[in-house]
Amino acid sequence: MTIPEDLRYTKDHEWIKLLEDGSTALVGITDFAQHELGDIVFVELKSAGTVLKQHEVFGTVEAVKTVADLFAPVAGELLELNALLDSAEIVNQDPYNDGWLVKMKVASPEAVHALLDAEAYRQLTGE
């Protein structure tokens, strides 16, 4: 499993990456999560403009065998949904790059830094 060092992680297996402006971030599911879910066939997300609290559900990922909720890693506003998700298998193929789910304006960049780093996430997953 791939666990990039430059991301932060949640216990719910989402990742977040602050962009260069320091207040906008990309969010997706981890390689571990996509592997556990299996073949992803559909992703449903709340619309851009939705304001989320930390841990609030912002969508679902539907795989062949199950449906999993997606939880906001931090509070903020959804700015953009990944247009490539029309082909949901992109999440399986490239969860950390082309398979990102949403771009969000984070309410507190400090909250991102408080999430799990790569080493802590490795320990959580046993990888």
UniProtKB/Swiss-Prot annotation:
Cofactor: (R)-lipoate
Alphabetical UniProt keywords: Lipoyl
Pfam families the record matches: GCV_H
InterPro entries: 2-oxoA_DH_lipoyl-BS, Biotin_lipoyl, GCV_H, GCV_H/Fam206, GCV_H_sub, Single_hybrid_motif
Domain of life of the organism encoding this protein: Bacteria
Listed PANTHER family: GLYCINE CLEAVAGE SYSTEM H PROTEIN (PTHR11715), GLYCINE CLEAVAGE SYSTEM H PROTEIN-RELATED (PTHR11715:SF3)
Name of the featured protein: Glycine cleavage system H protein
